[in-house]
């Protein structure tokens, strides 16, 4: 912004000259890509359910506008404000997740949503970044204050969130939260017994889900044996074959007419078919830019809380993208997880805006970090 001088002391000017503009540009490009891919994929989905062709495009644009406001507002905050915001979001989200278990509609066998007028809300999406920041704050406090049970507090923050995820059930998000928590414990330099405890809990939870939750067992069995209903994965793989390097052209793809979640969970397949390997590579690079730059800032940061929180948020953001892409390419069993900022979805878009807003706030250049609550 040429109009903003480095000597300008206004809030926006200080924000502009301290923000990671490469990450900001990558986030903006992902958001624009998401709208364009929704425009490519969603008319076919809209036709199948009997709504106007641009129904999902208009709705996604209505999500993008407040998401941009959230990114700007949250990225203006300092580390102390990020911690306070995370505490509020975490408590409210867990209360709403609990409410969803009792009054939320059952969708595909799970109680993850709350209906608020014409809108649906998935509280667990908002709890994810809040859980990461609070766990980082607890672990960092134990480093600053001898005797503070940081690992225990962080473990409780994780357990409360993961417990509600299991009750919904949502084993994919539980797995994501567990891996991120283990990574943060490792970065915090805690004893191996804590890592072993979380690792054992993750393995035990996965084995238990396989033996006691039929749809989990079904997905794993389909992946390993390639038997049963593998239509979505096979169709997705065929889309990449059809697309080749340059794609068949915008609007010319066929996968969106047969995949039920072409505009959400399998939007990467639409990108592969219509825009080819080249576009898919660009999307992966954009995710890589955000994650790598955040981790680089974390390495250079002296504040232990900022190190852990930025690393945790970046890991969660990158892992979610990797899981979605891996499912689309049949590298792991199917799991309904959105591609950040690219897949259609209101709760996902707004929660990811909160995530990257916190990440941008924590990685801003500042003279000294704010400590304490």
Model-identified regions with their sequence ranges:
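Juxtamembrane loop-helix boundary motifs flanking transmembrane segments in multi-pass membrane proteins
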Residues: 7-11, 49, 53, 155, ...
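Hydrophobic alpha-helical transmembrane segments of multi-pass inner membrane proteins, especially
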Residues: 24-40, 46-232, 269-327, 354-358, ...
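Short, Lys/Arg-rich, polar N-terminal cytosolic tail immediately upstream
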Residues: 1-16
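Transmembrane helix boundary and interhelical junction motifs in multipass membrane proteins
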Residues: 170-175, 247-252, 262-264, 277, ...
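A juxtamembrane structural motif centered on a specific transmembrane helix
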Residues: 1-4, 325-373
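Glycine/serine-rich anion-binding loops at beta->alpha junctions
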Residues: 117-127, 167-169, 244, 248, ...
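TM-adjacent membrane-interface loops and short helices in multi-pass inner/ER membrane proteins
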Residues: 226-267, 275-279
